[in-house]
């Protein structure tokens, strides 16, 4: 990996093939690539290289307690990276992928990767961006986080990303400005009922059209009616307190 970052304009489709080839070289060398997505620009690395993931986290100034999501080229890849996927999670993927929805699932225990302190989970997404998906088809799953230093605004241009990340990234793919700083919506599918871990681009009402009992970000599950009734019955059965 060189000490000087490459910057390639991929807004011209004719440049994409060479850009993807260069990205493959960088990723094989355990380096990081800034790439466009359908939300904001992301910083990506080989998901199966612990060293590359460590480089990504260091570039962002982030610890292992905040592991990056994994972007995949299409929904079929999910079966190889996650297991015991609930039917409702499959339904969310079918409805919103490719798109701005990230699903937290149980990670396949046989995978030899180290994304950080994931507690046996993996956050997966299929981006709705032609450049990102072309790259993912070529190189496989990538650990990808927003292309910014932790605590700073997400980058909506490749230049924004370069101003924050500099030469900690070996290659910048410039596909023009993104329209919004809104991140993807994250849904935790490892809990019952499912819970929105981060509200983003996909609205809650659209998610609930697929999973009606989905909990909003910060919302607590309702107490079941039978539990309330049982508590009332128990209270009624207790003898009345006597006056002293």
Please describe what each predicted stretch is.
Residues 1-244:
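Active-site-adjacent structural elements in enzyme catalytic cores
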């Amino acid at each position: 990996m060189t000490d000087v970052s490459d910057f390639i304009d991929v807004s011209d489709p004719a440049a994409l093939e060479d850009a993807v080839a260069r990205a493959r070289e960088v990723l094989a060398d355990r380096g990081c690539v800034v790439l466009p997505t359908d939300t904001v620009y992301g910083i990506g690395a080989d998901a199966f290289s612990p060293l590359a993931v460590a480089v990504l986290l260091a570039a962002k100034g982030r610890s292992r307690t905040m592991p990056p999501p994994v972007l995949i080229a299409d929904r079929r890849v999910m079966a190889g990276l996650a297991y015991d996927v609930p039917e409702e999670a499959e339904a969310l993927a079918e409805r919103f992928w490719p798109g701005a929805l990230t699903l937290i699932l149980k990670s396949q225990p046989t995978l030899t990767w180290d994304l950080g302190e994931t507690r046996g989970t993996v956050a997966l997404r299929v981006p709705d961006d032609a450049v990102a998906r072309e790259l993912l088809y070529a190189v496989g799953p990538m650990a990808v986080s927003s292309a910014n230093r932790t605590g700073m605004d997400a980058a909506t241009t490749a230049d924004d990303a370069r101003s924050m990340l500099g030469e900690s990234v070996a290659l910048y793919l410039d596909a023009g400005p993104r329209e919004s700083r809104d991140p993807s919506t994250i849904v935790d599918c490892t809990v019952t009922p499912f819970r929105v871990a981060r509200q983003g681009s996909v609205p809650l009402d659209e998610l609930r059209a697929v999973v009606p009992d989905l909990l909003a970000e910060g919302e607590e599950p309702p107490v079941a009616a039978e539990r309330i009734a049982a508590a009332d019955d128990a209270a009624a059965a207790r003898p009345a307190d006597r006056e002293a």
